[in-house]
Structures are given as C-alpha cells and as structure tokens.
Regions:
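N-terminal targeting sequences that direct proteins away from the cytosol to non-cytosolic compartments
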Residues: 1-90, 94, 109-126, 137-148, ...
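Glycine-rich, pocket-lining loop/helix-strand segments that form or immediately flank
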Residues: 90-104
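Short hydrophobic/aromatic beta-strand or adjacent loop that forms the aromatic wall/cage
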Residues: 128-132
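Long, low-complexity hydrophobic alpha-helices enriched in A/L/V/I and glycine
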Residues: 153-155
Length: 195
C-alpha cells in the first residue's frame, strides 16, 4: 500500500519592524555598527535565521543600538543598548559582580539570579580589554508576560564614557536549546575603537 506523505511547513512571519531573516552557513551573522551608533564602533554576532531591526535610528532614542529577533520564537531576542556611563570608567565602578547581579534580580518581581561571572571584552586591535559582568536571571509568572517564565543574559561593559549592555532573552522552555547560541552572541561583542 502506498501512502502519500506530504509535509507542510509553518510559514515564518517576519516580525513587524524587522528585516527578513538573514542566514549564514556558519550559523551566525555578524553586524558591524554603522556611523550613527551612539557609542564606539563595534561588532557582534547574531544567530543565522534571525531578523534584524529595520529602523535603528528611532530605536536609538531609547538606547537600543541594534536588535535581533527569532521569527520562530518571539521571546528569543538579542539587543545592544548603549547609554551614558556618567563618571563610571569601568563596570566595577557600578559595584561588585554580586551587587550588580542582585540589582538586576531585584528589578522585577519573582526574578532570581541563576548565573554570574566576570570576563574581558576586547577593545580595539592592540590587546586592550575591558572588564565585563555577565548576569543571567530567570523571571517567572506575570512579569514575563505571555511567555510564562523567561531567562535573560546580559553582558555589561563600560568603555569611554558609555555603558554597553548586551541582552539576550528566551522563554524558559526554549532557554536550554538557545543558551549556548545566545551566550556566544553576547560574548562575541567587540569594541573596535580605542581612546
């Protein structure tokens, strides 16, 4: 007996305000910031198959310098936020890693820190590095909206009077499969210019 098996693919809808998904055989695309960035020039990897924010100029008015979204899972996002650092010359001027992690967890009800670490971010081509704090938090219930519970990973670096906050998010249910990929993106952030 012959059985006709036809497969159907769910149509992937490009999120409103985002470009069509970009793909790369390496599994990652690379963004080099444009001249309009509010900070120094930088690069960051973002997952293949994801969409890039179309109108970055209007997003910059609220501190978003780049934004990416998984069209198959709208809770999975990656964004670069740039803001004035005031008198801070390093992320350490904001406090210890423990203090910064506690502050991020306290920023929303039912949010807890699930990971934290120090690392270095490359600045320029001469071997200069800046201290970066990575903080991973999980938030549950109403705060995460229709996604139920969610996980957020941020990398925070201060250089040249600017704070660069790289934020990756995913629903808690998709985090186990997204974690390595999103961590790679957060860690790929590099500042291209030095003082």
């Amino acid at each position: 007996m012959l059985v006709d098996r036809t497969t159907s693919r769910a149509e992937v809808m490009t999120p409103r305000g985002y470009d069509e998904p970009e793909t790369s055989h390496t599994g990652f695309n690379t963004l080099r910031s444009d001249r309009e960035t509010v900070g120094r020039a930088y690069t960051i990897e973002w997952p293949s198959g994801w969409c890039k924010l179309t109108d970055v100029s209007s997003a910059r008015s609220v501190g978003v310098d780049a934004s990416f979204k998984n069209p198959r899972d709208e809770a999975s996002t990656l964004a670069v936020f740039i803001s004035d650092a005031g008198s801070r010359r390093s992320v350490a001027d904001q406090g210890s890693l423990d203090k910064v992690a506690a502050s991020r967890a306290d920023s929303a009800p039912r949010q807890v820190t699930v990971g934290k670490r120090r690392r270095k971010t490359k600045v320029g081509e001469n071997g200069t590095e800046a201290l970066t704090y990575d903080v991973e938090t999980k938030v549950g219930g109403g705060t995460a909206g229709r996604f139920g519970s969610a996980v957020e990973l941020v990398g925070i670096t201060v250089v040249g009077g600017k704070e660069y906050l790289i934020r990756a998010t995913a629903s808690a249910s998709s985090w186990p499969e997204e974690r390595a990929r999103l961590r790679r993106c957060v860690e790929s952030f590099r500042i291209l210019e030095t003082d």
